């Protein structure tokens, strides 16, 4: 397989081993204009986050669109467990609601991540019979925690109640939902301990710092990480061809809080619009995505088309079909 065929545009600092033919782009220069110019040369004006509810999901055009979609997917997914806490507690073996959200960002500075946290959770439209949902955001270090506290104090959120804490804080956690913000692999053990303590209340991983293909190397913690169901994920990619490059995206967006049956979609730009080229029931590995895009580029390459034309020409001359 050709090397460096595909490049992923990501904010999550995904890392790959040296044997992989994919490389993730992480700098501000590489991620510049991620949402607009990379994905659409013909922007659509009728975008709505509710398009996650349609049979054919629509990837976001701008960062604001991605935030709106992610907020809609997560809030509707959280509504069921938050509105039925007594039912959850009565069933001992019921699975703890664990969700995961991934939104690429150009700027991963403390102030930018704090702004993103407010955009997602500050005005999250969760429908609940009881008022004042409390969401606890756990940050991996004190710097991020302080930035988030300053952001939420500056922009008062009406609902829900938000609290920002350092994950290393030795205090009793009390909340309706706990979110691990931009966690690193080094704190997975602590995350598992907290999640087990909070059972059966919902927990969320938001923008993990590790890559999906790294998770198989987490040992006993691989199962813990894998127990978080992705409700929203959006990753840009670039397909490198012989004569030109093509742009696309890997995308998942849960519809109306229904997790079962939601697929992962791979889109590639064609004639200024993104079109679905593959669907996966489970999250595809880097190699699987590369295979799909490699085959697509091979089929559409001038060399392949010329070879097919010559083969058809010879068949016609010989009277064969």
Locations of the language-model features?
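Long C-terminal extensions of eukaryotic subunits of large macromolecular complexes
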Residues: 5-27, 278, 289-321
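Positively charged, amphipathic N-terminal segments that serve as targeting/anchoring signals
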Residues: 42-190, 197-199, 306-321
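A structural signal for leucine-rich repeat
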Residues: 194-196, 220
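A conserved mid-domain beta-alpha-beta active-site/ligand-binding segment of alpha/beta enzyme cores
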Residues: 214-299
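Short acidic/glycine-rich loop or secondary-structure boundary segments that cap or lie
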Residues: 187-189, 212-215
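N-terminal chloroplast transit peptides
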Residues: 1-57
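Short beta-alpha junction loops
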Residues: 139-144, 207-213
